[in-house]
Amino acid sequence: MQDVTIIGGGPAGLFASFYAGLRGMSVRIIDVQDKLGGKMQIYPEKIIWDIGGVAPKPCNEIIKDMINQGLHFNPKVNLNERVTDIRKIAERHFEVETDSGQIYESKAVIFAVGGGIINPKPLQIKDAERYRLTNLHYVVQSFSKFKGKDILISGGGNTALDWARDLANIANSITLVYRKSDIKGYEAMISVLKALNVNLLPKTQIKELIGDNKCECIKEVKLENIETGEVTTQAFDDVIVSHGFDHENPLLKDCTSKLDLYDEYRVKGFGNTTTNIPGIFACGDIVHHDAKVHLIASAFSDAGNAANLAKTYINPDAYKEGYVSSHNDVFKESNKKVINQYI
């Protein structure tokens, strides 16, 4: 039996893993995705500015640092597993069941699933999925992949606009299509895109994807003007779709241990990561309380609280907080390696 099962491998879950290890607890992380990092994996090229004391850097670089830190104390990690139930058997005895049929036991549970299971909304046209492994994209993993190419972006939200801006000086051409006549609230961004020579096509949607002879790659796209019905055909090297995300969090509704909810997707918290069930703690975007700030930085604070409270739940005689890292002997050997990098 582990001391703590952490459900979710994003910023909150990874720092909870680190801090629980710092407090001497054994940890298991379970995540439905095939890699750690949570929602941040959707925006790997985005520059993150708002983590205190961390210089602006691409999201994927921050993910690497968070994963290295989260795995420092060697937690068990189970990826590609969806948690389907949490059962409190007794005080300091929980069962966490996954869709693999496995049941993992622990003395406490930390809920750190962010916004839940997030999947990009697929392009709703015939045979679109056949191109997903080639040149139909729902996530921009690397800007360099699109260098010198003719790109079509479909979507009118901030992500689509950001991708159009960021790729404008990398790609050969950018065409942005969106269903509305204008994009309210983004007037300044539209001006930027025009200055970057992005081809803006309002009231336009993708009607058909035309593949090559082997139907492995998109070669042309039929675009339809929603207002006039006019259809034009243009050649593109890649198509990027940004139509938002589907959020799933069936665990909150279906699990045996019923957590009080703020809405359908978030746990009602009390400001210190405790929930209505002793032994289950919630941190990061999944928890809501009146003082909540939805930032990566605040997820770290939540995670530290959750780990500390899990420690005292398991062992009421334990110190309420751990020693700070600068004075903690647990890092004695690791510090030598770090110091050598600066000599």
Curated annotation (Swiss-Prot):
Q: Which cofactor does it need?
A: FAD
- The EC number of this protein is 1.18.1.2
Keyword rRNA-binding in the entry? The reply is no
Lyase found in the keyword field: no
| InterPro entries in alphabetical order | FAD/NAD-bd_sf (IPR036188), FAD/NAD-binding_dom (IPR023753), Fd--NADP_Rdtase_type_2 (IPR022890), Ferredoxin-NADP_redctase_2 (IPR050097)
Q: How is the cofactor bound?
A: Binds 1 FAD per subunit.
Which is an annotated GO molecular function term of this record?
NADP binding
Record-listed FAD binding positions? D31, K39, Y43, V83, I118, D285, S326
Which SUPFAM superfamilies does the entry mention? FAD/NAD(P)-binding domain
Note the superkingdom of the native organism: Bacteria
Database matches in Pfam families: Pyr_redox_2
Q: Which reaction does it catalyse?
A: 2 reduced [2Fe-2S]-[ferredoxin] + NADP(+) + H(+) = 2 oxidized [2Fe-2S]-[ferredoxin] + NADPH
Q: Which UniProt keywords apply?
A: FAD, Flavoprotein, NADP, Oxidoreductase
The family note in this entry says: Belongs to the ferredoxin--NADP reductase type 2 family.
According to the record's subunit comment, the protein's assembly and interactions are: Homodimer.
Please give the HAMAP family that the UniProt record associates with this protein: FENR2
What's the protein here called?
Ferredoxin--NADP reductase
